[in-house]
Design a protein with these regions (language model features):
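Extreme N-terminal starter segment of soluble prokaryotic enzymes
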Residues: 1-4, 31
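Conserved N-terminal helical subregion
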Residues: 2, 61-66, 70-209
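A short acidic Gly-Thr/Ser loop motif
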Residues: 7-9, 186
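Glycine-rich FAD pyrophosphate-binding loop
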Residues: 8, 20-65
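N-terminal Rossmann-fold NAD(P) dinucleotide-binding loop
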Residues: 12-13
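Active-site catalytic pocket residues across diverse enzymes, especially alpha/beta-hydrolases
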Residues: 19-24, 195, 199
């Protein structure tokens, strides 16, 4: 069975690791899992290096993209079940926070929320961890072999009548068939267009100030 993940951001890398852990390893069926990503996934790439490559958009592999993340107890439990060493790497890259404070753009305090939660196996409370988006991505990406990530931009995904899926590439290279495709390629997802071909662009896109 061939599984293709589109996008090597946090979601794509996490999906890859989950599949590797939970897919059955016994029996006659074998699994091939490949990630296609349009941008560089080098662990140590910097924003300046990306500018030198003249790439218009940014991605998870850029040190400055996405700012910070607050990972709650439920998210930390997911990381723990996946790999305890992964959880430790993420915690070490950030800091714990017992409260989550929301403020207006003028700095006024709007609400303060308890940011602790219970673990799944014990009654011990777990604090939220605040970390950079890149450090979270880096911890996931470092556990994926380089040869399982292919740097290619996908132009179209087609669901075929025979049950297979066909992936076309922007560079015109030969198309690839896959039994299962996981779309982890962001809000302007190419994979999503294959499922909802008639869907229009978001009429109310987010506005960042």
């Amino acid at each position: 069975m061939k599984i293709v993940i589109i996008g090597a951001g946090i979601a794509g890398c996490a999906a890859y690791l989950e599949l590797c852990k939970h897919l059955p390893r016994s029996g006659s069926e074998t699994y091939e899992i490949i990630i296609y990503e349009a941008y560089s996934t080098d662990l140590n790439v910097t924003a300046k290096e990306r500018e030198q490559k003249q790439e218009e958009n940014t991605h998870s592999s850029t040190l400055l993209v996405g700012g910070g993340l607050g990972i709650g107890a439920n998210g930390l439990n997911v990381l723990k079940r996946l790999d305890e060493d992964l959880l430790k790497d993420v915690v070490r890259s950030g800091y714990v926070a017992s409260t989550f404070n929301m403020k207006s753009k003028n700095g006024w305090s709007l609400v303060s929320i308890d940011a602790t939660g219970y673990t799944s196996s014990t009654e011990q409370r777990m604090h939220m961890v605040a970390a950079s988006r890149h450090s979270m991505w880096q911890a996931l990406r470092s556990r994926i072999p380089d040869e399982h990530i292919i740097n290619k931009r996908i132009s179209e995904v087609v669901a075929c009548p025979n049950g297979m899926n066909l992936i076309h590439f922007v560079d015109g290279s030969p198309s690839v068939e896959a039994d299962l495709i996981i779309g982890a390629d962001g809000v302007r997802s190419t994979a999503k267009r294959a499922i909802f071909p008639e869907a229009k662009e978001d009429p109310y896109p987010p506005n960042y100030e």
